[in-house]
Amino acid sequence: RQHRLWLHLHGDSDAIERVLAQDPEARILWAHSGFDRPEHVRAMLRKHRKLYADLAFRNDHASGGKVDPAWREAFIEFPDRFLVGTDTFTPERWYYIAEHADWSRAWLADLPPDIAERIGWRNGETLFASMMAPKK
């Protein structure tokens, strides 16, 4: 709380609800969007205005360069609340970074350009710039 850091929460929606019950002002980046269905992710984003979701280590939101229709609805409804992610928690995963970047660029190109830009990098820049503000 004191430093207004982001919590990168690896958990399901129940874990998010419990954290927010203790600290309604918590700033949460929901890892892997909880591996939940897009309809449920949308419901959580509607309910919690300070909740953001990353798309790391999941591939159900796009296939063959095309965004899944249910995920498209989520991205259009909440263009400022999703971030692309890679989840390179083991060294072996670094080998696939270029391939993952190409895959992400392909499905992002299936979205309107402004939404693709936000999800692809601008949302991350905005979120993490808020932690870099000079101290007064």
What positions do the PLM features span?
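Active-site neighborhoods of metal-dependent hydrolases
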Residues: 58, 85, 90, 94
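Charge-rich, low-complexity amphipathic helices
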Residues: 22, 41-42, 63, 67, ...
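Residue-level detector of flexible, active-site-proximal loop/helix-junction positions
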Residues: 35, 59, 89, 123-126
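Mid-to-C-terminal alpha-helical segments outside catalytic/metal-binding sites
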Residues: 80-81, 91-136
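Catalytic pocket-lining loop regions of alpha/beta-barrel enzymes
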Residues: 1-84
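Divalent metal-coordination and catalytic microenvironments
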Residues: 32, 53, 87, 116, ...
